[in-house]
């Protein structure tokens, strides 16, 4: 067995800033058998809500972020700002939309899901109903997540609420 050695996070961040690009701005920093640690930069302006079958731990290294959370039963959305130095443990299956501002950095630790399905969900900004939802197995953020986000952004049909007819935007504005 090869024992791990420490990494210099500020140096890693400086050398890998180019990897934190929109729309997700996310890069796996370290991964083990059970957990993965992701570095997430900004800005992004996601309108999707991610539904993860496992808990996620957020730590804000630099700046602040907005974590939009939807109640799994009522779909009521709550906005929680995580300030620099702040942390939050998000319960499993809580729809959430991590919105990050320019020149910010955060860490997210989550359990590896090993074939479990997760979802991307969009809510209508007018009436709060679910506009679109896509369940999938995520093996790679770039390969699996980005195409789902881009498909939604490119389709007025997917962004139009079937209940109230509102055409939802492709970017969140606070």
Regions found by a protein language model. Give the residues of each.
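Jelly-roll (double-stranded beta-helix
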Residues: 1-59, 64-87, 95-174
């Amino acid at each position: 067995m090869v024992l791990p050695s420490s990494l210099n996070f500020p140096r890693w961040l400086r050398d890998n800033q180019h990897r934190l690009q929109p729309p997700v701005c996310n890069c796996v920093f370290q991964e083990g058998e059970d957990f993965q640690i992701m570095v997430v930069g900004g800005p992004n302006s996601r309108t999707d809500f991610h539904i993860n079958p496992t808990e996620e731990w957020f730590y804000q290294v630099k700046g602040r972020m907005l974590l939009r959370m939807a109640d799994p039963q009522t779909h009521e959305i709550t906005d929680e700002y995580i300030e620099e130095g702040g942390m939050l443990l998000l319960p499993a299956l809580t729809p959430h939309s991590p919105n990050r501002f320019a020149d910010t950095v955060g860490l997210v630790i989550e359990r590896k899901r090993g074939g479990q399905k997760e979802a991307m969900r969009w809510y209508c900004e007018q009436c709060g109903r679910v506009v679109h939802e896509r369940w999938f197995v995520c093996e790679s953020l770039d390969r699996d997540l980005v195409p789902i986000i881009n498909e939604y952004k490119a389709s007025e049909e997917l962004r139009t609420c079937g209940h109230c007819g509102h055409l939802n935007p492709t970017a969140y504005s606070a």
